[in-house]
Swiss-Prot record:
The keyword Repressor does not apply. NCBIfam families: S15_bact. The lineage of its organism: Eukaryota, Viridiplantae, Streptophyta, Embryophyta, Tracheophyta. GO terms for molecular function: structural constituent of ribosome. This is Small ribosomal subunit protein uS15c. It is found in: Plastid, Chloroplast. InterPro entries: Ribosomal_uS15, Ribosomal_uS15_bac-type, uS15_NS1_RNA-bd_sf. GO terms for cellular component: chloroplast; ribonucleoprotein complex; ribosome.
């Protein structure tokens, strides 16, 4: 992982980000995953921040629904994406 502006960014998505459509399911899942990881690290420090915890749950649900859609439409792209992002399969 590379650091850019204080944030960790996955190297394989940085170069693809410029070429790929930002509205694609893969890009949206990647974006949600970055936000989820940032919120999770925030909640480790601030355990009583319940509004951020609620936001984290909402993001997890959105990502789960997008992954379910991708798994239904194109299983190969789904497997590749979860492998690259290092997240569990549903």
């Amino acid at each position: 992982m590379k650091k850019k502006g204080g944030r960790k960014i996955l190297g394989f998505m940085v170069k693809e980000e410029k070429e790929e459509n930002r509205g694609s399911v893969e890009f949206q899942v990647f974006s949600f995953t970055n936000k989820i990881r940032r919120l999770a690290s925030h909640l480790e420090l601030h355990k009583k921040d319940f509004s951020s915890e609620r936001g984290l749950r909402r993001l997890l649900g959105k990502r789960r629904r997008l992954l379910a859609y991708l798994a239904k439409k194109n299983r190969v792209r789904y497997k590749k994406l979860i492998g690259q992002l290092n997240i569990r399969e549903q």
